[in-house]
Amino acid sequence: TDRSRGLGDVYKRQKSLREDKSITIEELAQRSGLAMEQIERIENNIDIPSLAPLIKIARVLGVRLGTFLDDQDEVGPVVCRKKEAKDAISFSNNAIHSRKHMEYHSLSKSKADRHMEPFIIDVMPTEDTDFVLSSHEGEEFIMVMEGIMEISYGKNTYLLEEGDSIYYDSIVPHHVHAYEGQAAKILAVVYTPI
């Protein structure tokens, strides 16, 4: 799997879309609520954005989240074979401090005009304990396939084991991570309105 290709596409597509719409980095930062430094670091392929900033950027640019991840657009149903789900894009859960935290395997990357983003996510162990909560418009569904996940949601924390699931409004500040430095695997579906 060539992860760097997928990662390069994210920063190239963001910059291209921003320039096509004649939006400056300053405007994108202001309208998305993100730091200008973060936008610059993403566009220079220094940092990999987590889903929350990417969703905010997509909304400002008037595109769906999948625009950053797609290879092609299919109008009809999209079948994702097991071998196709092995291609991954790695995201950090905090773009300023970390280069990689989760590997996202898109299950719908060629579906045109979608509002849901289904992923199998390999969650890497982390020693971090001071997680920065993020929020964005939409909803998320997570089911644990392997390991134990800890979901910080508002002022509450939930431990989910294999087979457990959670569905929440992502406008509430949240953070998803593996429990106590262990690896885990989840099925996640992110819904973002356009």
In which residue ranges do the predicted regions lie?
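Short alpha-helical DNA-recognition segment
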Residues: 22-41
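DNA major-groove recognition helix of helix-turn-helix/homeodomain DNA-binding modules
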Residues: 52-67
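Conserved short histidine dyad/triad with adjacent acidic residue
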Residues: 84-94, 100-110, 118-136, 170-173
